[in-house]
Amino acid sequence: MCRDFTYIDDIVEGVVRCLDKPATPDAAFDPLAPNPATAAAPHRLFNIGNSQPVELLRFIELLENALGREAIKRFEPMQPGDVVATAADTSALEAWVGFRPCTPLELGLERFAAWVKDYPFP
């Protein structure tokens, strides 16, 4: 299975950039043919993802390396609703605010591991 992991700083950057460029209302909005991007209360939805899916076992390996610990792995069959792979399409975000998350998984996990070590769970 593959998943698309995104570092938190990239998510924050994407959200902040969107706050700086909100959708604007359209005086010609037609409620019979609604377009949420130009409604009286306009909004836009964006995927904020890294767009680089990684095998879950590779993710676990990188996390183990970053934390200096081996995970206890328990393999389960796919659950109803699971998909084999996911990846974010950030093209709309890039077009709207000129931003694409870019923190490599390895770096994000190293930073996460440092944070976990600084703020351990009880």
Q: What kind of region is each of these model predictions?
A:
Residues 1-122:
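C-terminal substrate-binding subdomain of Rossmann-fold SDR/epimerase-dehydratase oxidoreductases
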